[in-house]
Amino acid sequence: MAQRIFTLILLLCSTSAFAGLFDAPGRSQFVPADRAFVFDFQQNQHDLTLSWQVKEGYYLYRKQISITPTKADIAAVQLPTGVWHEDEFYGKSEIYRKRLNVPVTVNQAAAGATLTVTYQGCADAGFCYPPETKTVPLSEVAAAIDATPTPAVTQTSETSKPAAQLPFSALWALLIGIGIAFTPCVLPMYPLISGIVLGGRQRLSTGRALLLAFIYVQGMALTYTALGLVVAAAGLQFQAALQHPYVLIGLAIVFTLLALSMFGLFTLQLPSSLQTRLTLMSNRQQGGSPGGVFVMGAIAGLICSPCTTAPLSAILLYIAQSGNMWLGGGTLYLYALGMGLPLMLVTVFGNRLLPKSGPWMAHVKTAFGFVILALPVFLLERIIGEAWGLRLWSLLGVAFFGWAFITSLQARRAWMRIVQIILLAAALISVRPLQDWAFGSPSAQAPAHLNFTAISTVDELNQALAQAKGKPVMLDFYADWCVACKEFEKYTFSDPRVQQALGDTVLLQANVTANNAQDVALLKHLQVLGLPTILFFNTQGQEQPQSRVTGFMDAATFSAHLHDRQP
């Protein structure tokens, strides 16, 4: 008897241990969205907390989270900072892993009030889920006396344009500041400023001279840092509006005008009366003393010359776009430090370190005009799309390298011939996208992609299966938000081996980007958890579950899968 019981226990254990060996090959390795992103909420009067428990190997997109109240008023939602994730098609995106808590302040909620929460995530293995929508019932909350009304709809995804996505970082501000120091409006002033800082004294120790110059630069940096903090704080209040297409176009026009001022078409500077007052205030300070030197530096930060106004304005607009106060203050501090480094060198070592003035300083100013022109191209690229953005970058590159090449022709040194060849080659490379646009791209000769027949409902699928006339059918699910779907199109479906293997197969595709009721019904009918998912049907119109594909496959793997699948 005991032997039989022992045998039965072994049988049960072996069945449990090896059950996975007999699972259907087509079974998805991915869990449903509700298990990948476990959503929960908790309300305590005015305080509501939305929480997600994110499964290991999965992540949520920050920009895909939106919160919309109904019969309720909530404060603006501030999503926490995520971690950066980058892919080929969507670039950098902020994501959340492991756990996410979002606090929401409910100013007022009537009877039957709800909160509609939409979110979307993917798996690291290249599998993305359709947008999930949850309805959160709210308890009645009376409006506080000092509650400030907020807009009825809070779209947190609009605020997810982080400063790091802008084309230059705060470190670039240091290099720009150093470059501005060599423009014709700034460089000739350094010997004069150095003399004022030292109070006209020629015999000071090196340490004392360096200290006074450093204090002057810190005074100037304080003014710029405060300006950066103010602009960043203002930009934070209007950050969502700063992402509107009309606002982006307006900013692009402003940046273009700033660049034109660097080209000498017109002059930007403070009114002369205000500059005179600031100069008089600076002259009242005593040179050679730390306090007086610091005040002179702080006032000097307010006096913008024609060469510094445009770059400073561009950096301020960049900071306003970011809405990041730490970045705003730090960027302007580094910019002022970059402008002050040459002054410190002149104060300590004298004028012998300065290069001689000449036409080259005007060329430095013009070069900064091209740098500023890169900003409107970056902003417009969000509106006009990647293709037109590439053409604008191409046009800017041709203009810059062409100008640099023509300018270099004035040089007489032999080694400049090598520089001229490099500049000419860079201009020819930059013109390539414009050439492809005007005369057609050689890539147009690339193998054609698969010719899919679009379906969107269960009835259309059944009709297509009935019309297949004894041929096998492949159904591909596609969405614009699915990165791996785009990889399938670019790398897998364009491969000749794959196209040959699918030569006798009827190709269907369901675009579920909208994730509307029809899309949801089709996904539910076929038990599709997420994308990419590819289904195969035999000649009788029956799905072959063991052949189902979930997740990305390269051309070689997918081609082998096509040959191995059952007819």
From Swiss-Prot:
Record membrane topology: Multi-pass membrane protein
Cross-referenced SUPFAM superfamilies: Thiol:disulfide interchange protein DsbD, N-terminal domain (DsbD-alpha), Thioredoxin-like
InterPro entries registered for this protein in UniProt: Cyt_c_assmbl_TM_dom, DsbD_gamma, DsbDN, DsbDN_sf, Thiol_diS_interchange_DbsD, Thioredoxin-like_sf, Thioredoxin_CS, Thioredoxin_domain
Transmembrane segments: 170-192, 212-234, 246-268, 297-319, 326-348, 358-380, 387-409
GO CC annotations, alphabetized: plasma membrane
Domain Thioredoxin: 435-567
Pfam families, per the entry: DsbD_N, DsbD_TM, Thioredoxin_7
Function: Required to facilitate the formation of correct disulfide bonds in some periplasmic proteins and for the assembly of the periplasmic c-type cytochromes. Acts by transferring electrons from cytoplasmic thioredoxin to the periplasm. This transfer involves a cascade of disulfide bond formation and reduction steps.
UniProt record similarity statement: Belongs to the thioredoxin family. DsbD subfamily.
Name this polypeptide is given: Thiol:disulfide interchange protein DsbD
Organism classification: Bacteria, Pseudomonadati, Pseudomonadota, Gammaproteobacteria, Enterobacterales
Gene: dsbD
